[in-house]
Amino acid sequence: MDLISVILISIGLSMDAFAVSITNGAMISKVTASEGIRIGLFFGGFQALMPLIGWSIGIKFESYIAALDHWIALILLSIIGGKMIYDSVKENQDHKDEIACDYAAGEKKCLNNKTLILLAIATSIDALAVGVSFAFLKVSIINTIIIIGSITFVICFIGVMIGKKCGKLLKKRAEILGGVVLILIGVKIFIQHTNILSYIF
């Protein structure tokens, strides 16, 4: 597989993570470069790790993974997205959700590592399936995952910064929008993998 193909695959795989990163940047009250780097590292790291796992598993479990990846993505994204929507509209603020933390200047929202891991896994499921195909293609897996991880990191960092600008306009609605975006991404992955629209139209 040539370098251009690997780069195009990397960009394609990072699009869901890019959309989520924009949402994260809009949702977080205090967005800094270090926060963008942290989010980028999580998404880039898992986007690189998943193909490696898929490559290791190989062709033996290809059909099994293809049958479940869309369900895993749909369930994870729907749960996280639904929780974000619920937490943004509930009246009782005594119990803060897991994506809230305190800054010295006051209470600000940020994404904790647990939430980022779940988001990173959910948006890198496709990369796991692609990694399986790498097992029987002539690719340098180490070089490939480095490229995938690096491109995803850069794209997600940019996404967070874009979200930071949008967040000034979205304000309190950012979390609701974020939840909707996550659910829609999950539905999109599900539709793409099941071809359900072909049965309707």
Curated annotation (Swiss-Prot):
This protein's encoding gene: mntP2
GO cellular component, one term: plasma membrane
Alphabetically ordered keywords of this record: Cell membrane, Ion transport, Manganese, Membrane, Transmembrane, Transmembrane helix, Transport
Role description: Probably functions as a manganese efflux pump.
GO molecular function: manganese ion transmembrane transporter activity
Tagged with keyword Transmembrane: yes
Membrane topology: Multi-pass membrane protein
InterPro entries noted in UniProt: MFS_trans_sf, Mntp/YtaF, Put_MntP
HAMAP family in the record: MntP_pump
Organism: Clostridium botulinum (strain Hall / ATCC 3502 / NCTC 13319 / Type A)
Family: Belongs to the MntP (TC 9.B.29) family.
Name of the protein: Putative manganese efflux pump MntP 2
Cellular location(s): Cell membrane
SUPFAM superfamilies the record matches: MFS general substrate transporter
